[in-house]
Amino acid sequence: MISVCSQCDLDSPPELHRRPDESHSPLGDCPPGTFICDTVSVTSELSDPSDLGIPDASPYIELDRDQWSALASSAPLPLTQADVEKLRGLGDPIDLAEVDAVYRPLTALLEDYIATSRERAHRTGAFLGVSEPPTPFIVAVAGSVAVGKSTTARLIAHLLARFPDTPRVDLVTTDGFLLPNRVLEERGLMARKGFPESYDRRALLEFVAAVKSGSKRVQAPVYSHTVYDIVPDRHVTVERPDILVLEGLNVLQPAPRGSRPGASALAVSDFIDFSIYVDADPDDIRRWYLDRFLTLKHTAFTQPGSYFRRFAEIPDDVALAGANEIWESVNLVNLRENIAPTRGRATLVLTKDAEHRMSRVLLRKS
């Protein structure tokens, strides 16, 4: 699915990521602008690993591109360049060589995680004296708008479905859990579409919990990026797959604060088995966003019924100025306050360079 929506999927109130003085910081004692998820340089009382008395305080193993691509060199890569072109997102220049370098090791790693998860389930069943089929293994893919997370999700789903032990793979995006435009208008939230309060977070949580619990048939709403709204009476049906790939900006958000003291709160991330955060410099993401917007202006935005048709009918420079304003006032704010702080919750972080090529991988230590 090609995303033409200018906003992001979010699942956690912005106030959860602010200090009492409203300056941004997900860490209570950190200066504004410091992300807890920055595994390379976190400004805090313990920013120097020597303060902990250990040589390396990072929860991640860091590998550069060459180190990562050398792993799993014998693993199969059942894709062609034509397959890659069908799967990649608009504006993402990924080719077969990049897939070979990045996704061959990644799918081999995922296959190992899945096998380990199934073995653990088998041992637990033996301990309890019960026999239950394994529940779906859930892989989450998060990251900014325009960073390429949709391409990552599609490639992972396509590759994992080629393995004999996991032939049934479903891909669901969180776009379908946006509230309908009618509801947003009633609540005065159309201008904040894409912010946490514009999502049906309960429905999303119930969907993921049902899938992970092994429900035989679960449905998710369908969102149209052309009309910029939920499609009435249409659903995606998930029927107990081997793997569910869940893609969206909100999938790693922690649970919001409970309204009752001592109340237990669950988040989508509580049901995820393996999570991937696609990372890049915000300036690069902005450029990719504007490039994609201009391409859509001359393609998808021209379609009859397109919510964005007004952009197709104005000069490019005027349209790009509007797109840049959306980036600065909406997407960049969401990235800094809601998305980037979840990076440190991911199992694996894929960092891209300015040319959309993977430059670094961070893998959480077991």
Where are these predicted regions, by residue range?
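Glycine-rich phosphate-binding loop used to anchor ATP phosphates in small-molecule kinases
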Residues: 129, 133, 202-270, 327-342
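Extreme N-terminal, non-catalytic leader segments
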Residues: 58-138
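Hydrophobic positions on the alpha1 helix immediately C-terminal to the Walker A/P-loop
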Residues: 152, 156
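P-loop (Walker A) phosphate-binding loop of NTP-binding proteins
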Residues: 144
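Conserved lysine of the Walker
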Residues: 149
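Post-Walker A helix-loop "phosphate-sensing" segment adjacent to the P-loop in P-loop NTPases
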Residues: 158-170
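Conserved NTP phosphate-binding and transfer environment spanning the P-loop NTPase/kinase superfamily
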Residues: 43-74, 88, 93, 251-366
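Conserved nucleotide-sensing/catalytic segment adjacent to the nucleotide-binding pocket
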Residues: 93, 98, 170-172, 177-227
